[in-house]
UniProtKB/Swiss-Prot annotation:
This is Small ribosomal subunit protein uS10. It comes from Beutenbergia cavernae (strain ATCC BAA-8 / DSM 12333 / CCUG 43141 / JCM 11478 / NBRC 16432 / NCIMB 13614 / HKI 0122). Disulfide bonds: none annotated. Part of the 30S ribosomal subunit. Involved in the binding of tRNA to the ribosomes. PANTHER family: 30S RIBOSOMAL PROTEIN S10 FAMILY MEMBER.
């Protein structure tokens, strides 16, 4: 796998969970003998929702809710077969979305 690069993108609503998952990926791949760049924090996506509190009138009374999506990027340069195998066996939390590109 010489000259290849694996790019891993992590997304989660909880920043502590995504940081621990990124740390676990970096530790696993480093132990397997591959070079790792990252985790690089990408900009946090913020969605704000405005909801009217009352079902009938009082339109001026509103609630604002927000949802933040935290993102991290990890690059694995020249991955070894052992690193790829250990990456596939890694157990991560369900609330972390993982995208892997070769």
């Amino acid at each position: 796998m010489a000259g290849q690069k694996i790019r891993i993108r992590l997304k989660s609503y909880d920043h502590e969970v995504i940081d621990s998952s990124a740390r676990k990926i970096v530790d696993t791949v480093t132990r397997a003998g591959a070079t790792v760049v990252g985790p690089v924090p990408l900009p946090t996506e913020k969605n704000v929702f405005c909801v009217i509190r009352s079902p009938h009138k009082y339109k001026d009374s509103r609630d604002h809710f927000e949802m933040r999506t935290h993102k991290r990027l990890i690059d694995i340069i020249d991955p070894t077969p052992k690193a790829v195998d250990s990456l596939m066996r890694l157990d991560l939390p369900a609330d972390v979305n993982i995208e892997i590109k070769l």
